[in-house]
Design a protein with these regions (language model features):
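Bacterial N-terminal signal peptides that target proteins for export
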Residues: 2-12
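Structural helix-boundary/capping segments
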Residues: 67, 148, 199-290, 301-310, ...
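Gly/Ser-rich catalytic/binding loops embedded in alpha/beta enzyme cores
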Residues: 30-211, 230, 302-305, 310, ...
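Acyltransferase
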Residues: 58-59, 87, 295-320, 343-362, ...
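Gly/Ser-rich, acidic/histidine-flanked active-site/gating loops
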Residues: 36, 113-119, 248, 265-351
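Glycine-rich, small-residue loops and helix-cap segments
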Residues: 50, 104, 144, 203, ...
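Short helix-loop capping/hinge segments that flank enzyme active sites or metal/cofactor-binding pockets
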Residues: 102-122, 279-281, 336-404, 462-473
């Protein structure tokens, strides 16, 4: 009953908001805290110095979350738990205890990543009552570093999509997680709510997960920064899966410098300094410049010009057979592994829910079609709208195509002496939020550039570069680097964001 009353309150607050962005701005201003300009590093420093309290910052974040309820960014908003954690930080801080890296900083966690005591739905109705008893390791590391978890964020159902148009969970009048910059547009996915919460300046940081673009696509559409780490860099336990070969948790934040803080908390290592732009060599692959809308094309080319002027070496490179190899890996691996990985996960939850029961309750037509037609029967799309057995294609992908794709990346970085390849994270700015946003055509388009690196297992960062000249919506640039080069990639990203500057807040443009 308490959770029902809380949900009713959130929905009422969302509908009552006369102006979402204006109301969000006032929610922060009333606390004397500039949420619009705050970064994770600044928040941690000011909390440590005693310039602000965690109670004030957390209260401001919660107020803005309620004021922006029609964005559907949250599935669960844990006001009581967050304020308790914030108060505990403030009490400890008065005793001059050492400051932790995230001490007192409000963060959000995607709802397929387990947090003790809060529902972990993976955005699907069958799991709405699953409440884990312990944190997933990635969430535990943020909490151990002092983070205050204010809630679990909405997502594309079961992480199987790029739009975030999920009808199963909403706090506003219309379904689908909405863009921080235009509530009629998609937030992207599948880590939709985390990106929307950061873009709306509710929080400065959070966690998502990424199989084929799910921390990078929504950050590109909401003006935030993110890292898809090298597969295996972060622990994957306690996260509702798609594919053990491709899945990884990923940090999302206001800036790449903030992402670097989260990476250190999760993976360890010392501070990361920005790279010298004059010592950075970046390749551009022509095939990744296909299907761009005008705003993305203009913004990306302008970003490359800025990099050249700052001393970055930018060269054209060729990656032959990239699309062909990627096609032989992507769907065969994700769709085939999804069955066994989800069965194992459901068993571990102890809910007694079977994968068939899970599929029966799926609310999103696109995801239900994928589960019923492909995942459950272990099939793959075939020619002329047919389906074929998934096992032969999966075996071929793992034995031949994926190693060849990894070799292509490795050889390209080595032969052309590249630190990274650069490309528009997504080909278009955010599209209208409606059921059609989850179409197969849109899915294929939006993963065009993020999917290949995912299948190769290499790290990638998303850096905001501009607002589109016509749309005034965020445009992002991605850098993919060699396997294991996560820290070098973050250093380059920190240098790049100094060149590009931070995007204006939604209330300021």
């Amino acid at each position: 009953m308490e959770r029902q009353r809380h949900r009713a309150f959130v929905i009422t607050a969302a509908i009552a908001a006369l102006a979402v962005v204006g109301g969000a701005h006032r929610a922060g201003a009333e606390q004397g805290i500039d949420l619009d300009g705050l970064t994770l590093r600044q928040a941690a420093a000011e909390l440590c110095a005693g310039k602000i309290t965690s109670k004030a910052l957390t209260s401001a974040a919660l107020a803005r979350a309620k004021a922006t309820g029609n964005l559907n960014a949250f599935i669960t908003l844990d006001e009581a738990g967050a304020m308790k954690a914030a108060s505990a930080f403030d009490a400890a801080h008065t005793r001059r205890s050492a400051c932790k890296p995230l001490g007192g900083v409000p963060v959000v966690i995607k709802d397929n990543i387990e947090v003790a005591g809060l529902p972990s739905t993976a955005g699907t109705p069958a799991l709405k009552n699953f409440i884990p008893r312990k944190d997933a390791p990635v969430a535990a590391r943020l909490r151990d570093a002092g983070a205050v978890i204010i809630g679990k964020t909405n997502m594309h159902e079961l992480a199987f999509g790029i739009s975030g148009y999920n009808a199963a969970f909403k706090s506003g009048p219309e379904p689908g997680v909405r863009s921080a910059y235009d509530s009629t547009r998609i937030a992207g996915g599948s880590s939709s709510g985390t990106a929307a919460a950061i873009g709306t300046r509710i929080v400065t940081a959070g966690l998502g997960s990424d199989t084929g673009g799910s921390v990078r696509i929504p950050c590109a559409l909401n003006g935030c920064a993110s890292l898809r780490p090298t597969v295996g860099r972060y622990p994957g336990e306690g996260i509702a899966p798609i594919s053990h070969t491709r899945d990884t948790a990923g940090p999302m934040a206001a800036t790449i410098a903030d992402v670097a803080v989260l990476d250190r908390v999760i993976a360890g290592g010392g501070p990361i300094a920005p790279a010298n732009p004059k010592e950075v060599r970046i390749g551009v692959v022509a095939a990744m410049l296909a299907n761009l809308d005008d705003d993305t094309d203009v913004a990306f080319r302008a970003a490359l010009d800025k990099l050249r002027k700052a001393g970055v070496t930018v060269v054209d490179v060729d990656m032959p057979k990239l699309a062909d190899l990627n096609g032989q890996v992507g769907f065969p691996v994700a769709l085939y592994e999804a069955y066994d990985d989800m069965v194992a996960y459901l068993k571990r939850t102890g809910t007694g829910i079977t994968i068939e029961e899970l599929a029966k309750q799926i609310a999103s037509p696109d995801v239900k079609g994928t589960y019923d037609g492909l995942v459950i029967p272990r099939k793959l799309p075939g020619p002329d709208n047919s389906v074929v057995d998934g096992k032969p294609a999966y075996d071929a992908a793992m034995k031949t195509a994926r190693p060849a794709l990894q070799a292509l990346y490795r050889d390209t970085f080595t032969k052309d002496r590249l630190d990274a390849i650069a490309f528009p994270t997504v080909p278009k700015v955010a599209i209208p939020a409606n059921p059609e946003s989850s179409s197969l055509a849109n899915f294929t388009l939006f993963i065009q550039n993020t999917d290949p690196g995912s299948n190769a297992g290499v790290p990638g960062i998303q850096v905001p570069v501009a607002l589109g000249a016509t749309s005034k919506l965020p445009v992002g640039l991605e850098l993919d680097g060699p396997s294991g080069s996560d820290r070098r990639l973050l250093a380059i990203g920190m240098a790049l964001e100094r060149i590009f500057g931070r995007l204006p807040a939604p209330s300021a443009h």
